[in-house]
From Swiss-Prot:
The lineage of its organism: Bacteria, Pseudomonadati, Pseudomonadota, Gammaproteobacteria, Pseudomonadales. It is an enzyme of class 6 (ligase). A motif ('KMSKS' region) lies at residues 228-232. Belongs to the class-I aminoacyl-tRNA synthetase family. GluQ subfamily. It comes from the Bacteria. InterPro entries: Glu-Q_tRNA(Asp)_Synthase (IPR022380), Glu/Gln-tRNA-synth (IPR000924), Glu/Gln-tRNA-synth_Ib_cat-dom (IPR020058), GluQ/Sye (IPR049940), Rossmann-like_a/b/a_fold (IPR014729). Disulfide bonds: none annotated. GO terms for biological process: glutamyl-tRNA aminoacylation; tRNA modification. ATP binds at K231. Catalyzes the tRNA-independent activation of glutamate in presence of ATP and the subsequent transfer of glutamate onto a tRNA(Asp). Glutamate is transferred on the 2-amino-5-(4,5-dihydroxy-2-cyclopenten-1-yl) moiety of the queuosine in the wobble position of the QUC anticodon. Gene3D superfamilies: HUPs. This is Glutamyl-Q tRNA(Asp) synthetase. A motif ('HIGH' region) lies at residues 12-22.
Length: 295
């Protein structure tokens, strides 16, 4: 069987319920895949049990179904993929590409997110320590389909970053690269808050000899104070009975044409309309959009 030319995915985190910002990201990834006859996969990024909200996974699936989304194949849970992460991490550790770090947050807070390398050559044991990957003094760049050229010098702007936390939980940066490759994802459509993570992903892809996916980062939906919508700021979950109007609003947030007659349609009809008329070049070329400004 021939592999699809386009494999996309939506990968929510069950630290809360889906909100309008989640819907915009899900819709963009869904329409971008379906408009070219591609696959759309669903992955639950449940890497952090202490932050997971009870019942959120079930609620996320139910919401996606009520809003008309249909995914291909079985949903993947990252909590069931730990062996794959451990194998690669151990390989890098054995070859000196990764190392143990015992630095506390307090020690690092003055460095504004750029790791200064305190533990780089300390030779700490891996137990009760975070694991960091060594980064080169190189700039990584990519062409985003909406945001344009993006680049980051990993040494100066990131430093060696964590791939496994001190508590033993695997970091998003590691898991997302491994799982996207394992699932054959060719196109990653997600929020612009993850632009800064992408150069790190390019580096890990390089280490693993993986092909680079195409990237499209959609504007992040924010509150008036500039914070993104999310559980931390008590963003309301998507109501079960508002699928059609909220899907239409999400289309407008993505700059897509909306037919007035669609207001009387079902969620499935709105999605079908969106697929037929999808044009990624109409997505606003900006990092954020304030929710209150969306009609």
């Amino acid at each position: 069987m021939k592999k699809p030319a386009y494999i996309g995915r939506f990968a929510p985190t069950p630290s809360g319920y889906l909100h309008f910002g989640s819907l915009v990201a899900a819709l963009a990834s869904y329409l971008d895949a379906r408009a070219v006859g591609g696959q759309w996969l669903l992955r639950m990024e449940d890497l952090d049990p202490p932050r997971e909200v009870a019942g959120a996974q079930v609620a996320i699936l139910e919401t996606l179904e009520r809003y008309g989304f249909e995914w291909d194949g079985e949903m993947v849970r990252q909590s069931e993929r730990h062996d794959a992460y451990a194998d690669i991490l151990q390989r890098w550790f054995n070859h000196g590409l990764a190392y143990a770090c015992t630095c506390s947050r307090k020690q690092l807070e003055a460095f504004e997110g750029v790791y200064p390398g305190f533990c780089r050559d300390a030779g700490h044991a891996a137990e009760n320590a975070a694991i960091r990957i060594r980064v080169p003094e190189l700039e990584y760049r990519f062409e985003d389909r909406v945001q344009g050229t993006f680049h980051m010098h990993l040494g100066r702007e990131s430093g060696d970053f964590v791939i496994r936390r001190r508590d033993g939980l695997y970091a998003y940066q590691l898991a997302v690269v491994i799982d996207d490759a394992w699932q054959g994802v060719t196109d990653i459509v997600r929020g612009a808050d993850l632009l800064d993570s992408t150069p790190r992903h390019l580096y890990l892809q390089e280490l693993l000899g993986l092909p680079q996916p195409r990237y499209l980062h959609v504007p992040l939906i924010t509150q008036p104070d500039g914070h993104k919508l999310g559980k931390s700021y008590r963003s309301p979950p998507l109501p079960a009975d508002q699928a059609t109007p909220l899907l239409l609003r999400a289309l407008r947030a993505l700059g897509q044409p909306v037919d007035a007659h669609m207001a009387d349609g079902t969620a499935q009809e709105v999605l079908a309309w969106g697929i037929r008329h999808w044009n990624a070049s109409l997505i606003p070329r900006q990092r954020t959009i304030e929710e209150a400004r969306i009609a």
